[in-house]
């Protein structure tokens, strides 16, 4: 089951870091028990985590408040104000992004709105940094983490202290930086009691969920693209170009094989309202499983007999210029349409969101040679995957792997030793390929209708 997200105000989204740790401990114990391995066979730990969240701890490492997570919209105005004050050119050349609604802006929001909490901060962290800290007792972060928080200066190849100074944030709050692939600390006796892991196991790898997902799918070179359709949807394209016309709708982050000499960047387009839309339908229409919903959707023709769903009900959408338009159910005829129509319209609406986003990437000169996805989310749906493949006229390769498997495999890699993980994936994990359908016309018509509805709503927001 997905973890709950608290929303104390409209547009806010929070989770308790202690809950992450509690569930990490439960899951680790369960993996050890169900896999029937001896704990002393475990040689290292890899961490994949939800990106952009802000974790604040005191000197004892205790969280000072719930984490303000990736889909929280409270810092949109903070980021927009900083973008205006700093200027487009500096943000473009040094950050490759606008400050946006990311971790640095969220930290500034805390400084302005929760000064008593801000005064107690010893370090800020990303979610994966917090899990690594709980495992090792050491507080550090990575270039990945700082770049996803819009705190990395690509020109000087160091922490963007000038941005933190602009926000009035003390430089001492930034953790030390370690490499993605490095010895980042070892488990201790307390961790052994909580997780069942022996003391002395090193944490060797750490990356945010999207660069890690790309690594898991052997998406490491320019032209290779990883897609995922979980709670949020993501298109993650690797490039070596340190430039972008899009500083807000698309975001550029350090990839796992980035170096100052080999500037591999992940251009990320995020759709907050993705799998969460399908989950909402499942929970509120009483379906027993996603498989049942997929079967119901298959009973309905392309275009859902006119029903249109815009799935943007999970906070401000960056690809919509940080507008929070909410989810929309349109053209529903109470005498004609059924829950099956809503299932199909939801799958199509999410698929159309991907197509809309990929169009933005292509307009930004993003090269797309191959697209790969794991077999553990919406890309398991033939309706969803075929709709995307048909409208972008591109094959989508599906592999039986997950981010957790990729993070585990990454433990055995050394920096630069990426060929081995790619070879293993291609030889062992391939499932199938979704190819563009020959009869594109009904898909183009349905997408055109969806896009028209979206544009009308955007004009009024």
What spans do the regions from the language model cover?
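Extracytoplasmic ligand-binding clamshell segments of periplasmic binding protein
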Residues: 173, 179, 210
């Amino acid at each position: 089951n997905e973890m709950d997200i608290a929303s104390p105000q409209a547009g806010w989204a929070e989770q308790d870091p202690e809950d992450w740790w509690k569930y990490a401990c439960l899951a680790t114990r369960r993996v050890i028990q169900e896999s029937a391995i001896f704990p002393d066979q475990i040689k290292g730990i890899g961490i994949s985590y939800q990106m952009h969240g802000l974790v604040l701890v005191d000197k004892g490492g205790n969280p000072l408040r719930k984490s303000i997570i990736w889909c929280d919209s409270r810092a949109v105005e903070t980021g927009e104000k900083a973008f205006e004050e700093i200027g487009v050119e500096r943000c473009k050349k040094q950050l490759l992004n606008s400050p946006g609604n990311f971790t640095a802006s969220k930290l500034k929001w805390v400084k302005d709105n929760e000064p008593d909490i801000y005064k107690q901060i010893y370090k800020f962290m990303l979610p994966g940094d917090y899990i690594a800290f709980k495992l090792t007792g050491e507080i550090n972060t990575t270039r990945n983490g700082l770049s996803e928080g819009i705190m990395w200066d690509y020109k000087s190849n160091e922490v963007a202290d000038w941005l933190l100074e602009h926000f009035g944030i003390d430089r001492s709050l930034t953790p030390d930086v370690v490499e993605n692939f490095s010895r980042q600390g070892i488990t201790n006796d307390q961790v052994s009691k909580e997780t069942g892991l022996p003391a002395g196991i090193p944490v060797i790898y750490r990356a945010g969920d999207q660069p890690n997902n790309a690594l898991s799918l052997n998406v490491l070179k320019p032209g290779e693209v990883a897609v995922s359709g979980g709670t949020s949807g993501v298109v993650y394209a690797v490039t070596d170009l340190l430039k972008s016309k899009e500083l807000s709708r698309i975001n550029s982050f350090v990839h796992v094989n980035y170096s100052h000499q080999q500037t591999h960047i992940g251009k990320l387009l995020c759709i907050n309202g993705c799998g969460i839309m399908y989950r909402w339908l499942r929970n509120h229409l009483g379906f027993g499983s996603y498989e049942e919903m997929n079967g119901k959707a298959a009973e309905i023709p392309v275009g859902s007999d006119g029903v249109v769903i815009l799935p943007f009900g999970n906070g401000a959408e960056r690809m919509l210029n940080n507008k929070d338009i909410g989810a929309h159910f349109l053209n529903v005829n109470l005498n004609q349409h059924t829950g099956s129509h809503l299932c199909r319209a939801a799958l199509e609406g999410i698929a159309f969101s991907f197509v809309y986003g990929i169009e933005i990437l292509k307009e930004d000169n993003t090269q797309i040679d191959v697209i790969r996805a794991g077999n553990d989310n919406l890309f398991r749906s033939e309706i969803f995957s075929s709709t995307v493949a048909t409208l972008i006229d591109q094959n989508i390769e599906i592999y039986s792997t997950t981010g957790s498997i990729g993070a585990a495999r990454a433990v055995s890699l050394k920096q630069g030793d990426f060929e081995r993980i790619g070879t293993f994936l291609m030889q062992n994990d391939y499932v199938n390929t979704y190819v563009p359908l020959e009869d594109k016309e009904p898909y183009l018509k349905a997408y055109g209708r969806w896009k028209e509805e979206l544009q009308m709503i955007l004009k009024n927001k």
